[in-house]
Swiss-Prot record:
Its main location: cytoplasm. One of its GO terms (cellular component) is cytoplasm. Residues 1-22 are annotated as: Disordered. Oligomer. This is Fuctinin-2. Has a role in the physiological regulation of fucosylation processes. Keywords: Cytoplasm. It comes from Rattus norvegicus.
Amino acid sequence: ELPGLPKGEKEQQEAIEHIDEV
């Protein structure tokens, strides 16, 4: 979890990481 990121930004980052795994 990166500090300084908005909550929505954090959720998008997690979604992007899951896409990269697939």
